[in-house]
């Protein structure tokens, strides 16, 4: 083997090592080197719902009685940072009307290293809110009607966003005095005077960014908290 051939082979091998690893999937931790090589913009995108994602949603978030057209929804990809500083690929399905605003918010949260533990499609939990919330997942679209009505909920349209759901639970006190907490494992986090890195506090960055885009915060609701 000539020296020239050896040099070409060595250059080829070195190029292979310099290339980023296979395409990053939602939930994957991404190295700083990969982000530098590909650029942050590579990880932030809005697209129509891809076929493989729409197939995953069938019978889960996109139920048989879903009245929201596929064309009304958008698939977001982003990066988010967990409490340990790891940079993770996230994904979310939202209504196209808010897609650009939500991606802008998620990018700003990432840049500020605002901690978000998990951001996967709730379809991986079979669209079961309780299970996904126990996993502290952040998500949006999950088709459903408001209880005892024919009105599609905000989540059912992909117009509501839940962030760090275990530490920011839904809480309502019924007239009989019973407390409804979702997820049920979130009772320790009802006391909002306590601090946890995944708690959203009124006035913090997550609160301010969503409010600036016209979102209402569930923590401000009078008859329930979300």
Predicted regions and their residues:
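Bacterial N-terminal signal peptides
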Residues: 8-17
């Amino acid at each position: 083997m000539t020296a020239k051939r050896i040099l070409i082979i060595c250059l080829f091998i070195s190029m292979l090592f310099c290339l980023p690893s296979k395409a990053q999937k939602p939930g994957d931790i991404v190295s700083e080197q990969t982000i530098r090589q590909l650029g942050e913009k590579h990880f932030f995108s809005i697209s129509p719902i891809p076929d493989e994602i729409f197939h995953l949603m069938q019978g889960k978030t996109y139920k048989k009685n879903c009245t929201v057209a596929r064309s009304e929804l958008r698939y977001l990809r982003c990066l988010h940072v967990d409490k340990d500083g790891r940079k993770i690929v996230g994904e979310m399905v939202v209504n196209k009307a808010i897609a650009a605003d939500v991606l802008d918010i998620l990018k700003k949260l990432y840049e500020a290293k605002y901690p978000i533990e998990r951001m996967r499609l709730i379809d991986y939990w079979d669209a079961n809110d309780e299970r996904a919330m126990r996993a502290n997942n952040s998500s949006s679209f999950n088709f459903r009607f408001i209880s005892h009505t024919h009105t599609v909920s905000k989540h059912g349209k992909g117009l509501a966003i839940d962030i760090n759901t275990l530490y920011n639970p839904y809480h309502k006190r019924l007239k009989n005095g019973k407390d409804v907490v979702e997820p049920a494992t979130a009772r320790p986090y009802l006391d909002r005077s306590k601090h946890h890195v995944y708690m959203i506090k009124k006035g913090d960055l997550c609160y301010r960014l969503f409010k600036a885009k016209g979102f209402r915060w569930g923590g401000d609701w009078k008859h329930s908290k979300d």
